[in-house]
């Protein structure tokens, strides 16, 4: 049995959970999310708790047991508190700004890059820091990764877009001609 799946998931007072067939709908103060539940897993709602159990004993059932429990926990946290990721734009002349609903990035290319976030994602820019926020943890992480992909951190100078607080191990530059004969 999965360690994560064994523990019952507490439902906060401000969150409503309903199960319709194989679709679990979770609604909270920040919004509403629905997620499919695999038929190999049973979800039971009672006494402000959700319990997840598996139908059969197989490695796949065990994996889905833990995964489903973790996804439900993340969804409950998302609709009650929300998720956010902060990115830093580092580099001389590298800039980020919001133009209406689109994110405009100047990253040393000959043209600016425009990024329109998907529905449910909010972008904010303050002093070359981009904050990606939303209620879906997977979507917030995916959008942050897509923005980083426009200019990954350079391994020599550290220029580019990175997660806030991310420590880069910089490579040494060329050391040709120093002491060699």
From Swiss-Prot:
The keyword DNA-binding does not apply. GO terms for molecular function: rRNA binding; structural constituent of ribosome. PROSITE patterns: RIBOSOMAL_L6_1. One of its GO terms (cellular component) is cytosolic large ribosomal subunit. Signal peptide: none annotated. Pfam families: Ribosomal_L6 (PF00347). InterPro entries: Ribosomal_uL6-like, Ribosomal_uL6-like_a/b-dom_sf, Ribosomal_uL6_a/b-dom, Ribosomal_uL6_bac-type, Ribosomal_uL6_CS. One of its GO terms (biological process) is cytoplasmic translation. Gene3D superfamilies: Ribosomal protein L6, alpha-beta domain (3.90.930.12). Keywords: Ribonucleoprotein, Ribosomal protein, RNA-binding, rRNA-binding. Belongs to the universal ribosomal protein uL6 family. NCBIfam families: L6_bact (TIGR03654). Part of the 50S ribosomal subunit. This is Large ribosomal subunit protein uL6. It comes from Hydrogenobaculum sp. (strain Y04AAS1).
